Curated annotation (Swiss-Prot):
Keywords: Golgi apparatus, Lysosome, Membrane, Transmembrane, Transmembrane helix. This is Transmembrane protein 79. It is a multi-pass membrane protein. Residues 1-200, 262-279, 331-339 are cytoplasmic. GO terms for biological process: cornification; cuticle development; epithelial cell maturation; establishment of skin barrier; hair follicle morphogenesis; positive regulation of epidermis development; regulated exocytosis. It comes from Rattus norvegicus. Residues 222-240, 301-309, 361-391 are extracellular. Residues 1-96 are annotated as: Disordered.
Amino acid sequence: MTEPETLALLDMKDTEISEKSPPQASVLQPEEEGGTESPGAESLRVGSSVGSPTVREGPEDGPDSTISEAATLPWGTDPHPSAPLPDPPGWRDIGPELLESEAPIKSEEPLKEDANLLPEKTVRAFVPIDLQCIERKPQEERIKHREAGPGELRNFLPARLSHPEPPERKWAEAVVRPPGRSCGGCGSCGGREALRAVASVVAALIFFPCLLYGAYAFLPFDAPRLPTMSSRLVYTLRCGVFATFPIVLGLLVYGLSLLCFSALRPFGEPRREVEIHRQYVAQSVQLFILYFFNLAVLSTYLPQDTLKLLPLLTGLFAISRLIYWLTFAVGRSFRGFGYGLTFLPLLAMLVWNLYYMFVVEPERMLSASESRLDYPDHVRSVSDYRPRSWG
């Protein structure tokens, strides 16, 4: 076989090999373009020029023998740096139709920033991390809290730091602060509330003696003749029955509030609508005991002409407790006026009783003898006593 025929045969075999194995051709192609030739290529060229027996046996064995011999050539195992990556196994089984169908369709729309450009298998190897779930450091939270304006402070406050207030504090603040008003935390609201409370007590201090004197002078009734101490005590106790009216009314409202707001559990969460009436009833009972204890002692020292004060003080107690209940329910600081109308008469009676016990009649402090105020030299006799026309 002549040399031209051998070269033609080699060219035919090269074309068949390139058709059956395109990856090998692509691998060899960059090497030829780069100017570097592998040792296998040199041996192939030398054999073709000299007419080696390996090439001569090619036509007898067929193209398969040529591929096997090419596989046994002493090529380097390391891939060339400029060579592309080898294709995965099984690529020959994929038909051209599937490759065309799986080809990515270029969309005219620009890619989004959050679009996933990685293959599906690669995405599975990564675990997504939500930056919002990472706990921030307390220093960063403080910085943001300081930099935020007064209207934005509530937005940067994390939910996990908001500690719920106890229910007792909630309804107590709701009672002191009227609903619908917001406090900016400047501290002036507390001073105003205290000033209003003091002003209401001072108003009660001025209004209490004027009201008592006007009722004593202008109301058309007189107290009955009560010469003995026992009769005065009985009269005082009978007047005290009328003073229990606001307390009993408070108990009824308290029971209805328990039913309406389903607060029947004794150790459950207290509600503002229920606690208002409960505190009013408890405070009224305490003041009633102190008030009428001093009123009973006062009845033993008053002269006959001034016994009219007993029913007047009883009515003042009932009216003042109703005023306090109303102002306490609406959450006004002016409730000190109603409390002052109850506490100031109690304080005045206590001072009067101590004065008579230690100054006027110290010998009768612990005795049950008749008072000097009922003797002829202190009061009028029974014959001189003339009740008023309306008494």
